Amino acid sequence: MSSILIVRIRGSASTPWDLQEVLEMLRLSKQYSAMVYPKQDDIVGMVRKVQSYVTWGELNMDGAKALMARIETVKGALDQSFIEKELGLSTEDFIKKLVDGELKLNSIPSIKLPIRLHPPRKGFKGKINSFIGSGGELGYRGEKINELVRRMV
């Protein structure tokens, strides 16, 4: 099983209440917030319901390393000492388990969720209110989500 990364692109203005509830269930209440989940049918179903507000794809090692810089704990940034002390893992093992879907970020109580990101450097390549296939930024983008995350960290 692998992990998927979901990033909310659009804001909350004029969002229907049912889609807003699904976004809150996914912990994506604000624009440019991100979450990592194991790839399961129920999560993918919720993401497809709100795909006009988010972009998502499979997380790989490079994207997870970049994303690690933005994960915060109660005591500050996520660093090697926290991972070794709280989880008993090395940094590489933590990233590998996160990418493989074996580790859930929401199961670690001292990590602040969701992961807050910046708008991408050099802007979006397409429109933020249309889908990837039609020259936009929304919807499923596969492995290209990692390139977007590197620009948003």
Swiss-Prot record:
GO annotation, cellular component aspect? cytosolic large ribosomal subunit
* One GO BP annotation of this record: maturation of LSU-rRNA from tricistronic rRNA transcript (SSU-rRNA, 5.8S rRNA, LSU-rRNA)
Keywords, sorted A to Z: Ribonucleoprotein, Ribosomal protein
Pfam families annotated for this entry? Answer: Ribosomal_L30
Keyword Ribosomal protein: yes or no?
yes
Signal peptide from the UniProt entry: none
Q: Which GO terms fall under molecular function for this chain's record?
A: RNA binding; structural constituent of ribosome
Question: How does it associate, per the subunit comment?
Answer: Part of the 50S ribosomal subunit.
Family the UniProt entry places it in: Belongs to the universal ribosomal protein uL30 family.
Q: What is this protein called?
A: Large ribosomal subunit protein uL30
According to its UniProt entry, this protein's organism is Metallosphaera sedula (strain ATCC 51363 / DSM 5348 / JCM 9185 / NBRC 15509 / TH2)
